[in-house]
Amino acid sequence: MKITNSVCVSNRVPGALAMALLIAGCSALQPAPVENPNLHMLDARPVSQMAPERRDLVVEVGTPRAWPGFDTPQMAYVQRPYALEYFANNRWADSPARMLGPLLARALEQAGGFRTVVQAPTVVPADLRINSELIRLQQNFAARPSRVELTLRIQVVDVRGKRVLATRTFDETEIAPSDDAYGGVTAANLALHRVLMQAVDFCIAESAKLPQSATPTQ
């Protein structure tokens, strides 16, 4: 019996050793974590255009969502179609969708087209809700110079009427000033500025479909 036990143990040793080597090999293939990556911000320039009139409406900016692959602080890039990769030493300070919400609210507020603009979650009753969805934010290295591709979907909702007034997708491309992560950040902010200007115009135009409770003020 002792001989049998020794054989069983000796048979298990090579298997355990092989498993340990396999795990070690897989670990070696994993990229080493970066302790102090370079952090970057989305911070588009202030929107310059002003609304033709101020409507007595409260606008709520909903929490933006992001499509899979872009719901992360990692900075995405592509070198060939359908293959999403991330920079190892550079990342966003927060996920782009989370940074987008305050920027959209600020742009709507600066345009001066509404009585007030609030961000979700809020206890303030709203007339309009602006939902946003980040479909794509990536630096494309398939062409030279590289370029940033930004796609954002905006939905305007009549809160009191419980209906969607309109949905529109905005798509912008901006050539990066340099073929690196920082060049992509610069291009992303320029593209975002244009998208926010278009989104503000869209939201103001759609708000005209709603009655307002007070006389508009100039």
Predicted regions and their residues:
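Solvent-exposed amphipathic alpha-helical surface segments
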Residues: 111, 115, 199-206, 210
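Surface-exposed short loop/turn segments
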Residues: 27-50, 55, 111-161, 177
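Short secondary-structure boundary motifs at beta->alpha junctions and helix caps
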Residues: 82-91, 160-201
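Bacterial N-terminal signal peptides that target proteins for export
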Residues: 2-17
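Extracytoplasmic/secreted envelope proteins and their assembly/folding machinery
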Residues: 97, 101-105, 111, 189-196, ...
